Curated annotation (Swiss-Prot):
Gene field: thiL
Species, as recorded: Rhodopirellula baltica (strain DSM 10527 / NCIMB 13988 / SH1)
GO molecular function: ATP binding; magnesium ion binding; thiamine-phosphate kinase activity
Source taxonomy: Bacteria, Pseudomonadati, Planctomycetota, Planctomycetia, Pirellulales
Catalytic reaction annotation: thiamine phosphate + ATP = thiamine diphosphate + ADP
Protein name: Thiamine-monophosphate kinase
SUPFAM superfamilies on file: PurM C-terminal domain-like, PurM N-terminal domain-like
Amino acid sequence: MEQSFLAYLRGRTRQLPQVAVGIGDDAAVIDWPGSVSSDQPQLRQVACTDQILDGVDFRSEEQSLSDIGFKAMAINLSDIAAMGATPSSALVTLALPAENATEIAGEVYEGILEAAQKYQVAIAGGDLSTYDGPLSISITILGWTEQPWLRTGAEEGDALFVTGALGGSLLGRHLRPEPRVELAAKLKQTVNVHAAIDVSDGFSLDLDRMLAASRMGAELELETLPISEAAHQFAEKSGRTPLEHAWSDGEDFELIFCVAPEEAAIIESTDWGVPVTRVGKVVGRTGLWKRVATSKFERVFPQGFVHGETDVAAAN
């Protein structure tokens, strides 16, 4: 439902000149008005928003409210990182259950403020309301960049990378995600990232979205896919393989990105503080393809969480 409705909105909303990147990427990019100074870089505003709802995106009876507040900030920060931007400020809106509203707000804000301090984000404003319903948290984060990373910039031959390790987030990592804000800043200073996206709905599904936006595909070396220890643990109970969890589990909040092949060696030889793994290359034919022999590839299909739907095509 989400992707089809976004397509509908793109057709209905008016694209004004100040909106450089609108609906369809990890965040919007808004150009500042006025002339560009000859001796100052032009900074572009990046804005993203996410809402999480009790009973849908989290369960307040099973998780600490502080963790929920931290996560609400982190998922937005992950979108900012995927744009290659620096976060600056946030607007926080809470819709609170009327019963114990003050206590709930205080505990949620403990996590929000912890994340804000960790990633140097100012809480600039927001709104509070109470009603007879579940807790809802909506956060908008504003950031800036000179040149945003988009989903649309992948080029044939680009080397594909993913940060961190994938899969098994439901065993606990999803409670306190680590958005790759610092890593994105280091990448920005070191290489020219052509396209990027964060892994929120599943590695394969989000990779496919980035490539579709670029009208490209990918040839993947699935044996190189970085699989988390949690994915191995989860596989012991789920009946699925660790690779299947890495392929499709959501809420990893890692970054997928691509660079020109001549810059791949820079990525691989640099200590980024977290693992950054080469997993394949961008190709001109659409779709995802896995290597099965020296020069033979088979089509594989994305799988992950789709808002308003049950699943997408099987991964194999």
